[in-house]
């Protein structure tokens, strides 16, 4: 019998309450979640001092007490830029997940076009519109205004920037 493993991927620059809500809903639906923190050299997180390594470490800290969540990092530096790299990116992500033949990835996304791209490639993807009216872009641009939305493990990074 197959077991579904939820997959939530993103830049998480920074992780915020909308991401946490999506991860929690994925966990409730599937039981286990793999959170994939992705990025590349000089990406939008890197430009504010929040590179892939830091985001991965903060995400690990966020879920360190949760045995149902596994955090992985996906370095996209050598991949073609979105949207051209979908197939290579997906292949690398699936290799990273290292699922058994009885485990089936089910993607949870907050971008409708991501769900469409995954469906085209034969994967289950649940689109869940953004909640809380927040985005990582808003937080990067106005961290003090949106500090209450930042995931706890990422808060100190922004406090140090003040």
List where the protein language model places each region.
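Nucleotidyltransferase catalytic core that binds NTPs
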Residues: 1-162
